């Protein structure tokens, strides 16, 4: 009588490989445990996360039920957390803090620099610590260049040092009267008429 695996399986006379010398004295489950410990140690040395295998759902035994307790009047880890604090912790743990700070400069521009400046100037880009600010007129661009150090101090106070290192203040892009293939230089940018 033949089974379904008789034709495909290894031959009965094939030699079984001997265990290494340091495992030669172990048999059965002890050999398996020792081999598993060595495999886990090798995985840990490579920086891999080593678990205890799959665990099933937690079993509740009738006599060992633990009563749920209230958190009490003091602060506790189970208390509801503020959304801002949780997202800030998430950004720190994931290494997003620098990107979040850069985004907050542009997103909170009005709160950072004040209403008067925000009405006349908008941030357009922040690349490698250089914040590009576009003013609505050349007069406002000149005014912003004069108070540039105060603006950098305000930005550093709100979002932290090192996020914005320099300001690049540009005036508005003037209208172009250039038509055709050939061009003669004009009087310069004409963004304000008077």
Swiss-Prot record:
Bias (Acidic residues) ranges: 1-14
Q: Where is the composition biased (Basic and acidic residues)?
A: 30-52
Q: Which domain of life is it from?
A: Bacteria
Q: Where is this region: Disordered?
A: 1-81
Q: Which regions form coiled coils?
A: none
The UniProt entry, under NCBIfam families, shows: PRK03195.1
Give the similarity note: Belongs to the UPF0232 family.
Protein's name in the database: UPF0232 protein MSMEG_0004/MSMEI_0006
Natural source organism:
Mycolicibacterium smegmatis (strain ATCC 700084 / mc(2)155)
